[in-house]
Amino acid sequence: MAKPIYFEEHLTQAEMLEVKMKRQNLSIGILKETMPMENRVALVPASVAYLVGNNHRIVVQAGAGLSSHFQDIEYSEAGAEIAAATEEVYKCDVILKVAPPTLDEIEFFHPDQILISPLQIPLINSEYIQKLKEKRVTALAMEYMKDDDGSFPLVRIMGEMAGISAILTAANLLTATSGGTGVLLGGI
């Protein structure tokens, strides 16, 4: 018996082809922080090794990790390039900072560069925003980056660190050598 012919069988059918995404390797710059009392660094050597292992190029300004007790040799062994000149770091596609860049630092940025940093938006002025716009910099405020569950992981981590730091500072100030009574938990 003959099979019935359906009109749909003769229509042009869409074919799903696999499209390979071209993976873009990034160059990521880590600057030495210039804000007073800022001892943090944007990436630790272990994170650098992970990114380098995924074919990204990391350029670390010489001495960027010293305040956080990371030597340049540790970054170098993790696969980062150590740049003596700040200008070399600013040639990267992406700049990571722990503190917002100053107006002077924004001058070093080039068009279509990406800045990932806390921007402290409630504290910045229109001149700051205008300079970023003039430079055509895409600025991502770390403090507003959300996780899949809607939380702000960087804010949570910084809050935890601030809480631990407050306890340790208070304990230090309460010691007899710092002028305190030398009692950390009185009455217990």
Regions found by a protein language model. Name each.
Residues 1-27, 33-35, 106-188:
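Glycine/serine-rich phosphate-binding loop and adjoining beta1-alpha1 elements at the start
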Residues 13-131, 135-137:
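An N-terminal-biased, well-structured beta-alpha scaffold segment characteristic
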